[in-house]
């Protein structure tokens, strides 16, 4: 069984978060937040194996320019407590080689692009020297708004904020879909390992039947 880890978090201006800073840190960029004048230089940080911007078909070319896009993403949010982006972090199987992990990371990013019509920064990180050497993972930073031919539009991913359990169901579904993509890539690589998106408790209950 391969390691499965997939979590989602939100970034809010109310907490002092900036999507420009988040993008710079995750991809090892040197970005200037034009709304604050603050620079975020992580170009010398280690551990970033690969990065790429993804956007829906027909999106303007500037959506693939991290400096321009994430500043546009910030400018689109005017409220002091606005959510400026979301992130999905996913473990990448150590059973795959570096190229296979990059291809998988792009496939996961494309899943989010097509499902939610957002732009996504894909940033693959390698294990830290002193950490678990199986800890390959990808950060998938998602725009707060949908992206179309005209650029940034209406707010995206409202299903994750739904009440009465709707948000939990939406998160459970995307975790399941992520596991499906990972397992397809493991199978294509000729590896017998698989991931399971369910909790350890749910897996144990099924095994006990």
Report residues per predicted region:
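N-terminal nicking endonuclease/strand-transfer module with a His-rich metal-binding environment
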Residues: 1-209
